[in-house]
């Protein structure tokens, strides 16, 4: 079974990614999904919807990571 790839922008950089959920993409890229906020096409995606929100052709996604420290 071949994967269908879509072109999108993530943090301003053009990427090709298999059509998958945002959660799957974040996990594959090594993001701690409990410490990120994701915006898809100017809409913030609630944490409980990351597993059900598909990446679509032409999406613009911003990933913001929170880091603690002092």
Residue ranges and their predicted role:
Residues 1-69:
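Ubiquitin-like/PB1-type beta-grasp interaction modules and other compact soluble beta-rich domains
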